[in-house]
Curated annotation (Swiss-Prot):
Cellular localization per UniProt: Cellular thylakoid membrane
Keywords, alphabetical: 4Fe-4S, Iron, Iron-sulfur, Membrane, Metal-binding, NAD, NADP, Plastoquinone, Quinone, Thylakoid, Translocase, Transport
Protein name: NAD(P)H-quinone oxidoreductase subunit K 1
Binding-site residues for [4Fe-4S] cluster, renumbered to this chain: C62, C63, C127, C158
Assembly, per entry: NDH-1 can be composed of about 15 different subunits; different subcomplexes with different compositions have been identified which probably have different functions.
Names of the cofactor(s): [4Fe-4S] cluster
Species: Synechocystis sp. (strain ATCC 27184 / PCC 6803 / Kazusa)
Pfam families linked: Oxidored_q6 (PF01058)
Amino acid sequence: MSPNPANPTDLERVATAKILNPASRSQVTQDLSENVILTTVDDLYNWAKLSSLWPLLYGTACCFIEFAALIGSRFDFDRFGLVPRSSPRQADLIITAGTITMKMAPALVRLYEEMPEPKYVIAMGACTITGGMFSSDSTTAVRGVDKLIPVDVYIPGCPPRPEAIFDAIIKLRKKVANESIQERAITQQTHRYYSTSHQMKVVAPILDGKYLQQGTRSAPPRELQEAMGMPVPPALTTSQQKEQLNRG
């Protein structure tokens, strides 16, 4: 007996639904939605990167002591997926902790170039960012590591606390989450993450590099000499008398 096309059975309806392409939008079943995750390649790639940042152990001054404190149980930076490495070929993050000298600059650039892409840099401490207390009269300190390699996050302080390093890691993870695979060939500094717009007031520099020309450098003050029983040079006594006459 041939099937009646006017009254199709349930089996025929199911078979027809499987063969024909329905005009309506296909519905995702509950089983499929619970077992399949829909995402993009960029999101998956960035998630894998930001969850396993491997920093290179690089320290040249006292700031590295604060970074070494993160390895202990009090701060435990392993919960961020940070695994310290001693080889630049196994690291994708370098934290420049300490002063960078002219002699160390070529070695730092070589370490950065040996790191595989994608790679990131965190400048930790005032000496790394601007030269710090060595920026006024030092002939060997580099005034900013960003003159050598591109920097993603800056951590000011002398030295910064371990909590500040965690804050920098979180900001770097947010920066990594917004990247795209198409930008891997771009070496310029893009997509920097700024947390706060600071309203800084420009003031005159305290260290102008002219303190060697001050009179107290050539001879101590007269009060100090008298208190310590130091002999007062005649030239200094004459100059002080002239200053008193000019004032009077």
